[in-house]
Amino acid sequence: MKNNLFFQSISNSLHPIFNSEKFLQIMSSLSEIILLILIFSWILKKISSFKINKIISRMKIIERLSVGSQESIILVEVKQLRLLLGVTKKNISHLHTFPSNSKDELIKETNDTLLQKNLFDRSLKNFSKTSWKKTMFYRIIPFVFLLSLCPSAHADMPGLTSHILDDGSQTWSVPVQTLVFLTSLTFLPAFLLMMTSFTRIVIVFGLLRNALGTPYAPPNQILLGLALFLTFFIMSPTFEKIYKDAYVPFSQEKMNMEDAILKGSMPLKKFMLNQIRTPDLELFSKLAHISSYKNKNDIPMRILLPSFITSELKTAFQIGFTIFIPFLIIDLVVASVLMALGMMMVPPSTISLPFKLMLFVLVDGWQLLITSLAHSFNT
């Protein structure tokens, strides 16, 4: 039943296109476009085939022979004479003069072989040029008659359509919505960095790697992937609320795009407000010359976003400080032991690295760190 309705809708939509008059107009317009393309290509070919008259030169280099990195012997023809010249980096010396009557056998044989090789290519080029000139006239004649006999067709650009919803609001058509969606994808990295828990997590992971003394393990790709999936895990309640409150009504055409964006921003605002420190919010409010707010939901994004970022940076550095303390103690102990033993030339990081890794594994560091990060967010 669904297939029959689908094919019936397709036939109904295509029936106006294949109407006799409209179909003739479409075909005539298509023929005009093809004719313009052919004429334009022919004009370009003619323009590109124009050759600039070269300056007549009485001197011609016949052959060149390199005898070193910067030395060569050149055979030059000047009027009726052929000169053999020796060319170096500093000077040019005359070696011998050949009269024009004495033909160089080597050059003649070379020219003969080149003429034999290029004979077939030249014939093909001549054939293509003549065939183009002969057939181009016969190609243009039918299109001239077609243009003179066919009626003119005009194509109108489809306008940007909109739909009226049940509540009286207005929504744009699907192509416009698709364009807006694809444009919004360019802001996805900024959204991920400035409005989620990704900033705090990735900074803590980077500080952990520096505290361990392993700048290349784990690699950046592993840390970014772990931070990304942990961000989705922490933000999943917020994303689910955005999906239910904003996306589902918008997909069912119960809400327009503007209301959906406002409705979807409310859970993100609530998440960011729970992480923002009061001094940071007061600082940016003071810089924006805003004294007070009636409600937390009235705080604009231009104040909320920088306050959230600065709060996240401060929290991430505090967590990183607590991570550095045990590893710093290990470095100090190892350095003191090496100094006491007189091993001045041994770098302490080489000795302390195994102890740091052993400590991190014994306390189950990854589980402890991820658990602490997940509980550090006030959701």
UniProtKB/Swiss-Prot annotation:
<keyword id="KW-1133">Transmembrane helix</keyword>
<dbReference type="InterPro" id="IPR005837">
    <property type="entry name" value="FliP"/>
</dbReference>
<keyword id="KW-0813">Transport</keyword>
<dbReference type="GO" id="GO:0009306">
    <property type="term" value="P:protein secretion"/>
</dbReference>
<feature type="transmembrane region" description="Helical">
    <location>
        <begin position="357"/>
        <end position="377"/>
    </location>
</feature>
<dbReference type="Pfam" id="PF04347">
    <property type="entry name" value="FliO"/>
</dbReference>
<keyword id="KW-0472">Membrane</keyword>
<keyword id="KW-1005">Bacterial flagellum biogenesis</keyword>
<keyword id="KW-0653">Protein transport</keyword>
<keyword id="KW-1006">Bacterial flagellum protein export</keyword>
<dbReference type="GO" id="GO:0005886">
    <property type="term" value="C:plasma membrane"/>
</dbReference>
<dbReference type="GO" id="GO:0009425">
    <property type="term" value="C:bacterial-type flagellum basal body"/>
</dbReference>
<feature type="transmembrane region" description="Helical">
    <location>
        <begin position="23"/>
        <end position="43"/>
    </location>
</feature>
<feature type="transmembrane region" description="Helical">
    <location>
        <begin position="178"/>
        <end position="198"/>
    </location>
</feature>
<keyword id="KW-0975">Bacterial flagellum</keyword>
<feature type="transmembrane region" description="Helical">
    <location>
        <begin position="319"/>
        <end position="339"/>
    </location>
</feature>
<keyword id="KW-0812">Transmembrane</keyword>
<dbReference type="GO" id="GO:0044781">
    <property type="term" value="P:bacterial-type flagellum organization"/>
</dbReference>
<comment type="similarity">
    <text>Belongs to the FliP/MopC/SpaP family.</text>
</comment>
<keyword id="KW-1003">Cell membrane</keyword>
<feature type="transmembrane region" description="Helical">
    <location>
        <begin position="222"/>
        <end position="242"/>
    </location>
</feature>
<dbReference type="InterPro" id="IPR022781">
    <property type="entry name" value="Flagellar_biosynth_FliO"/>
</dbReference>
<comment type="function">
    <text>Plays a role in the flagellum-specific transport system.</text>
</comment>
<protein>
    <recommendedName>
        <fullName>Flagellar biosynthetic protein FliP</fullName>
    </recommendedName>
</protein>
<feature type="transmembrane region" description="Helical">
    <location>
        <begin position="140"/>
        <end position="160"/>
    </location>
</feature>
<dbReference type="InterPro" id="IPR005838">
    <property type="entry name" value="T3SS_IM_P"/>
</dbReference>
<dbReference type="Pfam" id="PF00813">
    <property type="entry name" value="FliP"/>
</dbReference>
